[in-house]
Swiss-Prot record:
InterPro entries associated with the record: Calmod_bind_C, Calmod_bind_M, Calmodulin_bind_N, CBP60
Example of a GO cellular component annotation carried by this entry: nucleus
Reported phenotype of the disruption mutant: Compromised basal resistance and systemic acquired resistance (SAR) induced by Pseudomonas syringae p.v. maculicola ES4326 toward Hyaloperonospora arabidopsidis Noco2. Plants lacking both SARD1 and CBP60G fail to accumulate salicylic acid (SA) and to express PR1 and SID2 upon both biotic and abiotic stresses.
Taxonomic lineage of the native organism: Eukaryota, Viridiplantae, Streptophyta, Embryophyta, Tracheophyta
Protein name (database record): Protein SAR DEFICIENT 1
PANTHER family assigned to the protein according to its UniProt record, in alphabetical order: OS02G0177800 PROTEIN (PTHR31713), PROTEIN SAR DEFICIENT 1 (PTHR31713:SF42)
Main subcellular localisation: nucleus
Length: 451
C-alpha cells in the first residue's frame, strides 16, 4: 500500500509539474503555428489536441522510472540475503573409461565391457558414503569442455547438449540414477544421435546431482567421461576391425570398401578373408598386387598391408611333409621351421631359399588341407634356436623318420582324432619330437586354399 501511495503521490506531482510545463510551452508553440495556419487553428484548439498526448508520454516515463528503481532495490536486497557460494567438498567421478568405438543405439559400457559406475569421493579421491541416497542426472556434454581441470556449476550447465530439432533426447535409457553406499551404476544408456554436428565433433557423458538432492551444506562437483566420437549405427556394419581377425571378411581391412572395386576383384579370385589376403601376400605378393590393379597405389597398399599384419595369428600351426622334407607353417604360410634333406632350417636366410619358397607355393596351391597342430609351451623357443642345435637335431633324429615311398610329395592327411599327438600309422613320416607340435587333426572343408 505504501508503494501504491508513493506511486500516486509521485504521479500527482508529476502531473502538476507537467501541466505547468505544458502551459508554459504551449503559448510559445502556438505563436509560430498560428502564424503559419492563421485563423484556422486557435490556441485553445491546439492545447486541447496536444495536452492529452503529452500527459500520456509523461505518465509512461514516470511509471518506467519508478518500476526500474523498485526492481533494482529488490534485487539488491536479495543479493544481500543470499548465502555466499561454497566450494565443492565432494565430487563425482566415473570409475573407468569408456569402451570405444561408440555407435548410436549401442549400449555404452566401460573398457571392461561392464556397466558404467559413478563413485562419490573426497578431494583426495577416497570413496565417501553419505549414508543417504543422492539422485543424479546423466547428461551429454560438449567434447571440448572443460578447457582446464576445474569448472563451475554454471559452466557445466551451459555445456550440456540438447537434442537437435525433431530428434529424440540425445541420451536414452537410465538418465537418472541414485548413489547408494557411495556408488551409482548406469544399467543401460545409449546415444541416439552422432557427434558430427557439434563444434568439437565429440561428446562427453556427464553426471550431476539432481536439484534438491544433495541436502544443506553438501556441495558435490559434477563428473564427466573422456571425450568420445559417436558414429551412426549404420556405420558399424561397414567399420574396420582393429586388430582384424583371420576369419574377418577382407573388406574389414583399410582401403578395401565393402562391395567396392578392390573387394570385388579379390572375391573373384577366392580371396574372401583376411587370412586369404595375408597368405597370398606371403606366397606371391606380385600376384596379389596384380589382382588389386593400378587403383591400389603404393601408399594405399602399405596402409592395407600394415593393417592386415596387425592380425593376431594365434597358436595354430600347419604341417607340410614329403619324402625329403618336413615344414611347419603359421596360418599365413610363413615357414617357422623346416627339415629338408636332413638339415633343419630356421634362420630367415635359409627359409627364403628358392627351394623352400617353391615348397610353400606348392602347399598353398593344393586343394586339400594340411595337418593342424598347436604350439606347445617350448615351441616358440625351439623355433628360434641356432644352427648348431639344428645340426645336432638333424644328426640324431633324421634317421628315425620313416618314409613311405608311395606317399606323394607334400602329401596331406584327412581328419584325425585330437588324441593323436603323433601320426605314425600308414607309414607316414612321424613328427619330429623336438618340434613340440600337438596335433588336433585337419579340416574337412573344401576350398582352393589348403589352410
Amino acid at each position: 500500500m505504501a508503494g501504491k501511495r508513493l506511486f500516486q503521490d509521485l504521479d500527482s506531482d508529476q502531473e502538476n509539474k507537467s501541466e505547468k510545463r505544458i502551459k508554459s510551452v504551449l503559448p510559445s508553440l502556438a505563436s509560430p503555428i498560428s502564424s503559419v495556419f492563421g485563423a484556422l487553428i486557435s490556441e485553445n484548439t491546439l492545447r486541447s489536441v496536444l495536452e492529452p498526448v503529452i500527459r500520456k508520454v509523461v505518465r509512461q516515463e514516470v511509471e518506467y522510472g519508478i518500476s526500474k528503481r523498485f526492481r533494482l532495490s529488490r534485487s539488491s536486497s536479495f543479493r544481500i540475503e543470499a548465502p555466499e557460494a561454497t566450494t565443492p567438498t565432494l565430487k563425482l567421478i566415473f570409475r573407468k573409461n569408456l569402451m570405444t568405438p561408440i555407435f548410436t543405439g549401442s549400449k555404452i559400457s566401460d573398457v571392461d565391457n561392464n556397466p558404467l559406475e559413478i563413485i562419490l569421493v573426497d578431494d583426495s579421491n577416497k570413496p565417501v558414503n553419505l549414508n543417504r541416497p543422492i539422485k543424479l542426472d546423466i547428461v551429454a556434454l560438449h567434447g571440448d569442455f572443460p578447457s582446464g581441470d576445474k569448472w563451475t556449476s554454471d559452466e557445466f550447465e551451459s555445456n550440456i547438449i540438447k537434442e537437435r530439432d525433431g530428434k529424440r533426447p540425445l541420451l536414452a535409457g537410465e538418465v537418472s540414477v541414485t548413489v547408494r553406499n557411495g556408488v551409482a551404476t548406469i544399467g543401460e544408456i545409449v546415444f541416439t544421435d552422432n557427434s558430427s554436428w557439434i563444434r568439437s565433433r565429440k561428446f562427453r557423458i556427464g553426471a550431476k546431482v539432481a536439484k534438491g538432492s544433495s541436502g544443506q551444506g553438501v556441495v558435490v562437483c559434477e563428473a564427466m567421461t573422456e571425450a568420445i566420437v559417436v558414429r551412426d549405427h549404420r556405420g558399424e556394419l561397414y567399420k574396420k576391425h582393429h586388430p582384424p581377425m583371420l576369419e574377418d571378411e577382407v573388406w574389414r581391412l583399410e582401403k578395401i570398401g565393402k562391395d567396392g572395386a578392390f573387394h570385388k576383384k579379390l572375391s573373384s579370385r577366392h580371396i574372401n578373408t583376411v587370412q586369404d589376403f595375408l597368405k597370398l601376400s606371403v606366397v606371391d605378393v606380385d600376384e596379389l598386387r596384380q589382382i588389386l590393379g593400378p587403383g591400389m597405389s603404393d601408399r594405399k597398399w602399405e596402409v592395407t598391408l600394415k593393417h592386415a599384419r596387425e592380425c593376431i595369428l594365434g597358436n595354430k600351426l600347419y604341417i607340410s611333409r614329403g619324402p625329403n622334407f618336413f615344414m611347419i607353417l603359421n596360418p599365413i604360410c610363413e615357414v617357422m621351421k623346416a627339415l629338408i634333406d636332413g638339415h633343419v632350417l630356421s634362420s630367415q636366410e635359409s627359409l627364403n631359399q628358392p627351394y623352400v619358397k617353391n615348397l610353400v607355393r606348392d602347399a598353398y596351391s593344393k586343394g586339400n588341407f594340411l595337418e593342424v597342430g598347436e604350439r606347445t609351451a617350448n615351441e616358440a623357443a625351439l623355433l628360434t634356436q641356432g644352427d648348431d642345435l639344428d645340426q645336432q637335431y638333424a644328426a640324431s633324429h633324421y634317421q628315425n623318420i620313416e618314409i613311405d615311398k608311395s606317399y606323394q610329395q607334400n602329401g596331406y592327411v584327412q581328419e584325425r582324432s585330437t588324441n593323436n599327438l603323433e601320426i605314425v600309422n600308414e607309414g607316414y613320416i612321424t613328427t619330429p619330437a623336438e618340434f613340440n607340435i600337438c596335433f588336433t587333426g585337419s579340416s574337412s572343408q573344401n576350398h582352393i586354399n589348403p589352410f
